[in-house]
């Protein structure tokens, strides 16, 4: 499976019990939504390997999972801190103006005046709206290391071109 076709949706944590259960850290909006995306792939030694989910449950406000064929604590320990990925093709298509975060990360951000503000390094959820975390270049004329730009489509974000990995914003470079 090609690495660029896989999107990370979570991570395995430490072991739970002696029968091969592992804690799970989901990066989906609703933690248990991670189970809607199957099959899973685990990134082991830099390579994505398919794995089958046997069971899952909540325990003390944590998600724990049992993976098929992992029946002992010692074997499960080898999977601690391993990323969980799914094939991008399973995600539904979005409406105009909606984007998956993984599509925005890595995009160059340019304001209406043509100033290159930096590259989207991550996204933040604030409750009111999502925020682009833009890592500025080391030669930024305004001395910025990072900019937080609200992802308000049409108000602040004027254009997203995923083919050229460019986001055009109406935002002052000094902020």
Curated annotation (Swiss-Prot):
Biological processes annotated in GO:
ribosomal small subunit biogenesis; rRNA processing
An example Gene Ontology cellular component term from the record? cytoplasm
Provide the protein name: Ribosome maturation factor RimM
Q: Quote the SUPFAM superfamilies the UniProt record gives.
A: PRC-barrel domain, Translation proteins
Q: What is known of its domains?
A: The PRC barrel domain binds ribosomal protein uS19.
Short name of any one Pfam family annotated for the protein? RimM
The record's listing under InterPro entries reads:
PRC_barrel-like_sf, PRC_RimM, RimM, RimM_N, RimM_N_sf, Transl_B-barrel_sf
Q: Which gene encodes it?
A: rimM
Under the subunit heading, UniProt states: Binds ribosomal protein uS19.
**Has keyword rRNA processing?**
yes
> A Gene Ontology molecular-function term?
ribosome binding
Predominant location category: cytoplasm
Which PANTHER family is this protein grouped with?
RIBOSOME MATURATION FACTOR RIMM (PTHR33692:SF1)
Which cellular compartments is it found in? Cytoplasm
User: Lineage, please?
Assistant: Bacteria, Pseudomonadati, Pseudomonadota, Gammaproteobacteria, Pasteurellales
């Amino acid at each position: 499976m090609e690495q660029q076709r896989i999107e990370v949706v979570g991570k395995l944590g430490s072991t739970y019990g002696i029968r091969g259960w592992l804690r799970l850290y989901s990066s989906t909006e609703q933690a248990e939504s991670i189970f809607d995306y199957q099959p899973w792939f685990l990134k082991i030694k830099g390579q994505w390997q398919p794995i089958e989910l046997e069971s899952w449950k909540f325990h003390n406000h944590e998600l724990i999972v049992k993976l098929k064929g992992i029946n002992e604590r010692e074997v499960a320990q080898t999977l601690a801190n391993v990323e969980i990925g799914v094939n991008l093709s399973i995600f539904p298509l979005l409406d105009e103006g909606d984007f998956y975060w993984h599509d925005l990360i890595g995009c160059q951000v340019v304001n209406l005046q043509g100033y290159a503000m930096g590259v989207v390094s991550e996204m933040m959820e604030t409750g009111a709206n999502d925020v682009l975390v833009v890592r500025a270049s080391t030669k930024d004329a305004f001395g910025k290391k990072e900019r937080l730009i609200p992802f308000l489509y049409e108000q602040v974000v004027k254009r997203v071109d995923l083919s050229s990995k460019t986001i055009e914003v109406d935002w002052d470079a000094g902020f």
